[in-house]
Amino acid sequence: MDIRTVLKDNFLQYSSYVIKDRAIASVVDGFKPVQRRIIHSLFEMHDGNFHKVANVVGNTMKYHPHGDTSIYEALVNIANKDLFIEKQGNFGNLFTGDPASASRYIECRLTPLAFDVLYSKEITIYESSYDGRNNEPLLYPAKIPVILIQGSEGIAVGMAAKILPHNFNEILNAVKSELLGESYDIYPDFPTGGIVDVNEYADGNGKVLVRAKIETIDEKTIVIRELPFGETTESLISSIEKAIRKNYIKVSSINDFTAENVAIELSLPRGVYASEVIEKLYHYTNCQISISVNLLLLSERYPVVYTIKDLIKFHAAHLQKILKMELELQKSKILEKIFYKTLEQIFIEKKIYKLLETISKEENILSIILSEVLRHKESFSREVLKEDVENLLKIPIRKISLFDIDKNSKDIKILNKELKSINSNISSIRGYSINFIDLLLAKYSKEHQRKTKISLIKSKNVKEIATKNMKVYLNLAEGFAGTSLFDGEFIGNASYYDKILVFRENSYVLKNIEDKTFIDKKNVCALVYDINNSKEQIFSIIYFNRLDNFYYVKRFKIDKFITDKVYEFLGENDEFVDFSLNPEFVEFSTNKDIVKRIEIDNFMVKSRSSIGKRISSNNLKKVKFK
């Protein structure tokens, strides 16, 4: 066989396996296979007591062929969702990122919610485990959108899923609204709290902006109280320290007082205040992160991208389907009870059992009793079978002699009342489903209050908050400028985003600020171009035109530029005379030595390539800015 064919076939098998059996969760119950197997093991082992996690992992290995480590990590992950597994012992710290204790030291058991919304053994479809020795659930008949509440993340071949967790109460209320035909909006809710901007959430397939919750104790002390989703105190502090090393922010000390709640205290040095540091924390550290989401799930073993509303609609219909199946199952059980109680009563009340005294041949017993019972077939809800007669013949004489017909009739009446209620629920399954959600909310809503605040985050441009932490020097004679040129003249403080603006006699150029940059020796001046404020700066030039022998004033702004590109502002027949940033007057003297002044505002601001305004129609001796 050709090696390319072998590789292609094996790759397809591998990629299909990873997608279907490892990385992507199901739309029905929200579980990946390993998670489903853990829950199944806990249902199997359930006796009301806590179980060693090591034992749960060992039992799960009967179903999961990938070793104990992956099972242990998945169990800890599910347990920390605080939904279906109750914990006892150290399961790690969500805030600090500290790991859980070894599996032999920690215990767990299922929560009541798991039994309320997952466990329904009689309607669960089972399949053989990987070795054929055991049966495991194909899917759980989940009554709530588990995937939206827990969230999920997985990377498969050529695709990835990133589903954020949502609030339990809000998801259930959304399903209820869907059943009622009402509108609703669903947004993420993170166990770490924080602040989330959902403007670009795009119904579960866009992105969110998440911020830490930061408080100001005083103008010199900042405390981080809540973390962005996916961050720990360790990773957050590491990002702050990195920003400090790069001189983006100034912090004198960082103290982590996190225990049950997050508390990272930042102390600020002299001359630095909380109001200016907080915005920089959001821009330069992991105090603010963007999370892209992709609602990819398995539907009937195929990957499908959903929206939040798609999932709510699916689970509203799925809830009705599951509840109806359970009601139909209850109905069949009650009908069976009514049938057998009726059969038993007729057998005893009509004294059919006495026929046993008259039958001489054993092989005739079933047929004779059955024919006698069938004389009352209108009393039965289904056909009477030979197996039913065999059950009658097993009734002890003592029970027959003590049989209470009145009590049995009352029992049948109660069962018929239950049957009527079940039939009513089946016929109005939508209302029954809404009532089921209300019962869940009444039972569990207090445990699942929203932790993340939804807010519009107005981020400043990073250039606006950049710290001017570089001192720039100029040596005009040698033609150098930079931050390490200490023998030069200090020309200003600059941020990473500022530039050095170099003016020559007929052009200008903007350069990046470096340790030492050659800017040429034939320069008029060089200065720091503030990326935020210099766009409004007016530059004034006096030049002499050799063709008409007149002096001109040109004024312009530099609001757009390309770094290192030379921009000319004088033509080949123009001769540079003077340059100024903020002149008040243009002063000139005539051939008769008369000195005059014109206010600078008389000269309009135009573009750099436009012709300047002529100062005077007379021949002038000297012109300069004042």
From Swiss-Prot:
Protein family per UniProt: Belongs to the type II topoisomerase GyrA/ParC subunit family.
Protein name per UniProt: DNA topoisomerase 4 subunit A
Xref: PROSITE patterns: TOPO_IIA (PS52040)
Annotated InterPro entries: Topo_IIA-like_dom_sf (IPR013760), Topo_IIA_A/C_ab (IPR013758), Topo_IIA_A_a_sf (IPR013757), Topo_IIA_dom_A (IPR002205), Type_II_DNA_Topoisomerases (IPR050220)
E.C. number: 5.6.2.2
Residue(s) at site: Interaction with DNA: 32, 64, 66
Gene Ontology, cellular component aspect: cytoplasm; DNA topoisomerase type II (double strand cut, ATP-hydrolyzing) complex; plasma membrane
Key word Secreted present: no
Site location (Transition state stabilizer): 104
MF annotations from Gene Ontology: ATP binding; DNA binding; DNA topoisomerase type II (double strand cut, ATP-hydrolyzing) activity
DNA-binding listed as a keyword: yes
Annotated function: Topoisomerase IV is essential for chromosome segregation. It relaxes supercoiled DNA. Performs the decatenation events required during the replication of a circular DNA molecule.
Localization per record: Cell membrane
Reaction(s) this enzyme catalyzes, per UniProt: ATP-dependent breakage, passage and rejoining of double-stranded DNA
Domain Topo IIA-type catalytic: 24-439
Active site feature: 105 (o-(5'-phospho-dna)-tyrosine intermediate)
